[in-house]
């Protein structure tokens, strides 16, 4: 008889907004996930990454600003999202694995770096609204706009970068995710809804 499958979604701020908060949140979260696995469920875990992407984006920008002599360039939002999927998955993998081993359960836990295709005509590309990164001064906002980035004013606070959040059309790595679930492994994927990509011939 096939096992029941469940998707556990860790929503906005469920893993905190910085590294210590994430570490603290992983423990009880992993225990809940282990409860489902122990009772016979196959589990796929998805998670938000908005605070983490903002933190990485800010850090990469400040690295460029503080060390111009090194020739660093700002990291695209897609790269920041990929980095966040990696380190969130790393913490979740280890937390879930530990929770299972303490119960005598031996299962592989894997993170899939996940991309999702998007419609090039999605409204979000033309009218971005998702806020990321720290609040900026007016001068910093002007510099961001000069680089081609979109910025919105936050009343009473300052300015913040805004990015597109298109609706996913398809998961690029869906076959890998299904293969791992079919092998009775725990899968962590679709961090932040997946990294939006556009199909351009054979390239993404």
Where do the protein language model's features map onto the residues?
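N-terminal glycine-/serine-/threonine-rich phosphate-binding loop
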Residues: 1-46, 55-67, 179-184
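Active-site-proximal beta-strand/loop segments in catalytic clefts of secreted hydrolases
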Residues: 10-11, 49, 114-116, 191
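Short, basic, glycine/proline-bearing loop/turn elements
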Residues: 13-20, 156-164, 199-204
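Short, active-site-adjacent cap segments at secondary-structure transitions
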Residues: 14-16, 50-54, 118-121, 195-197
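Conserved mixed alpha/beta catalytic, RNA-binding, or beta-rich assembly cores of soluble enzyme
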Residues: 14-16, 171, 186-204
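Short Gly/Thr/Asp-enriched flexible loops that form oxyanion-binding sites at enzyme active sites
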Residues: 55-61, 93, 199-201
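Ligand-binding beta-strand-loop-alpha-helix segment within the catalytic cores
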Residues: 63-187
């Amino acid at each position: 008889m096939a096992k029941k499958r469940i998707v556990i979604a860790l929503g906005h701020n469920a893993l905190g907004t910085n590294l210590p908060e994430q570490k603290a949140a992983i423990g009880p979260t992993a225990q809940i996930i282990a409860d489902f696995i122990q009772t016979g469920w196959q589990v796929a875990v998805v998670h938000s990454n908005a605070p983490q992407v903002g933190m990485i984006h800010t850090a990469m920008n400040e690295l460029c600003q503080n060390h111009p002599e090194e020739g660093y360039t700002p990291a695209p939002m897609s790269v920041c999202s990929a980095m966040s999927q990696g380190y969130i998955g790393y913490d979740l993998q280890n937390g879930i694995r530990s929770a299972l081993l303490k119960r005598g359960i031996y299962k592989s836990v894997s993170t899939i770096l996940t991309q999702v295709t998007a419609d090039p005509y999605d409204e979000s590309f033309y009218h971005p609204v998702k806020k990321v990164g720290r609040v900026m001064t007016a001068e910093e906002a002007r510099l961001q706009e000069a680089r081609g980035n979109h910025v919105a004013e936050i009343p009473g606070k300052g300015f913040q970068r805004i990015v597109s959040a298109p609706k996913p059309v398809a998961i690029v790595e869906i076959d890998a995710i299904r293969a791992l679930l079919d092998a009775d492994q725990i899968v962590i994927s679709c961090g932040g809804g997946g990294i939006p990509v556009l199909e351009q011939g054979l390239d993404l």
